[in-house]
UniProtKB/Swiss-Prot annotation:
SUPFAM superfamilies (UniProt xref): P-loop containing nucleoside triphosphate hydrolases (SSF52540), Translation proteins (SSF50447)
Name the record gives this protein: Elongation factor Tu, chloroplastic
Molecular functions per Gene Ontology: GTP binding; GTPase activity; translation elongation factor activity
Amino acids binding GTP: N47, K48, Q49, D50
Coiled coil regions, renumbered to chain: none
tr-type G domain location: 1-125
Protein's organism: Pandorina morum (Freshwater green alga)
Localization terms from the record: Plastid, Chloroplast
Reaction catalysis annotation: GTP + H2O = GDP + phosphate + H(+)
Phylogenetic lineage: Eukaryota, Viridiplantae, Chlorophyta, core chlorophytes, Chlorophyceae
UniProt EC number: 3.6.5.3
Alphabetical list of Pfam families matching this protein: GTP_EFTU, GTP_EFTU_D2
GO cellular component: chloroplast; mitochondrion
Principal location listed in the UniProt entry: plastid
Keyword GTP-binding found: yes
Amino acid sequence: KNMITGAAQMDGAILVVSGADGPMPQTKEHILLAKQVGVPHIVVFLNKQDQVDDDELLELVELEVRELLDKYEFPGDEIPVVPGTALLALEALIANPKTQRGENKWVDKIYELMDKVDSYIPTPERETDKPFLLAVEDVLSITGRGTVATGRVERGTLKISDNVEIVGLKPTQTAVVTGLEMFKTLDETIAGDNVGVLLRGVQKKDIERGMVIAKPGTITPHTKFEAQVYVLTK
């Protein structure tokens, strides 16, 4: 459920596959879900390289992953694949948080991975000129401050003190934005941001995943709609 919620909003994804074990059943499921919800680009990280003694085995795993991506209509031949080990990179960074490029081969692999992400996954144009819309993913209650709704801004911009409507599942209600946070406090959030919106006068029980926060008057609830549904089985 959480994978689907997140994937539906991604500009791209890093697919992590164990170089020691190869693709697992959930690997196939995640690739299929990524395709179903429209994730446009994937970069592959072959983890646990330190546990693979034979380079040919790692090459076989890479080939298997590329074939799997091809099967689900991703361009398996051109997708970047970076081998490495997340654990040893993390241990090196814990030992020395200021580790720079060229100082540790496993940390360098993470830098290489992020270079591939930057070069292969383009930054899409954001719809900042349209009315504000955010799909609620989670709701938190912060003592002394109020209710925070988190999610991805689908379009538009939002500033502190703006009025918004909370729409869906329950009667539409209005609220005032008293704070915006994305790793740090913001004055404004724009399309593409994953943000926490602090709302005045709204109880945690009044808002839940599946609702949207929107510019007043721009979104209305509907009782009928057409949808394409993909059913998962256990």
